[in-house]
Structure formats: C-alpha cells, structure tokens
Design a protein with these regions (language model features):
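C-terminal accessory helical subdomains adjacent to catalytic cores in phosphodiester-
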Residues: 3, 20-38, 48-158
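Catalytic nucleophile-elbow at a beta strand-turn-alpha helix junction centered on a G-D-S/GDSL motif
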Residues: 6-17
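Short glycine-rich substrate-engagement loop in P-loop NTPases that contacts/grips substrate
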Residues: 44-46
C-alpha cells in the first residue's frame, strides 16, 4: 500500500478493521496488524472530533497523498455533527478552512443514511449467524425494562 497515494482517516478500531478487510478482499491490498495498530495507512482518529487536530498531518506530512475520510453519520443523541448532511458539512467546512482540496469523504454506513459502521456490519451479517443477533436483541429488550441497567453499546453487539 505504500505506493498508493492515499491515506485513510476513520473514527475507530471497528472502522479501521473494516476498511483493512475491505481493501484486502476487493483490492488485494494487505495491511498487517502491526501497520494497522501503528496507524501506518489507516489512521484511527479515535473520535470524529479529533479530525480537526489533524491539519499538520493531512496537509503537511501527507501533502503528496489524497486523504480519504470515513466518518459515521451518528444520530443526534450521540454527537453535535448528527446525521449525513451535518457530517458532510463538518468535513467540507474543515477542509475549506484549511484550504485543502485533496480529500474525499465517505459517510458510513452507506453514504446516504444516518448510522455507523456497526449498522453496516449488522446489515451484511451472514444469514447463518442471524440467530446471534436475535438472541442479543432479546437480551437488550430484557435490559431495557429496568431503567437501572445500561444497555451495552452497539459495538458490543457487533
């Protein structure tokens, strides 16, 4: 991948692993676990709002690369950049402020709807494994009946 003139930025480990696997399956690009952990080709921002602190890395250290930015279109309960349109606007406004044009953005899960990489993964699960989600959904329903209990994050389900 070192000869490909792109660098990828994403929100978290799940996104990073998904993108690594996608590149391997569809483009035969191998990224080792070590390179993934060291953010060599796919930069794990750890949070969408940390993108705004990446100016030096994106426009100076990676000036010869095109930046591909993958962010979740979280709902309004999760973030102030809620939804597809606000996520696109957030990235475009930031890149405009930096006067940076060598980028593209893809909003997960499908570049049109609100959601996360976990929503995408849930929708593409092998039908043989659907029983696991049915069981998990019952578990969440049971927990939701008691307000003193916390329902696990969707990342736990996936």
């Amino acid at each position: 991948m070192s000869n490909i003139a792109i660098r990828i930025f994403c929100e978290g480990i799940s996104d990073q692993r998904f993108l690594r696997d996608f590149l391997k399956i569809h483009y035969q690009i191998d990224i080792s676990d070590k390179d993934l952990k060291n953010n060599k080709f796919i930069q794990n921002l750890e949070s969408w709002n940390k993108l705004k602190f990446q100016k030096e890395k994106i426009i100076e250290s990676f000036s010869e690369y095109t930046s591909l930015i993958f962010l979740d279109a979280d709902d309004e309960k999760v973030t102030d950049k809620a939804g597809f349109d606000k996520t696109i606007a957030f990235v475009n406004d930031l890149m405009s402020e930096w006067n940076w044009k060598k980028y593209d953005v893809f909003v997960l899960p499908n570049h049109q709807d609100n959601g996360t990489v976990e929503d995408l993964l849930e929708n593409i699960i092998n039908i043989k494994n659907k029983k696991i989600f049915d069981c998990w959904n019952g578990f969440e329903d049971c927990l939701s009946k008691d307000n003193s209990l916390t329902i696990p994050a969707k990342k736990s389900k996936i």
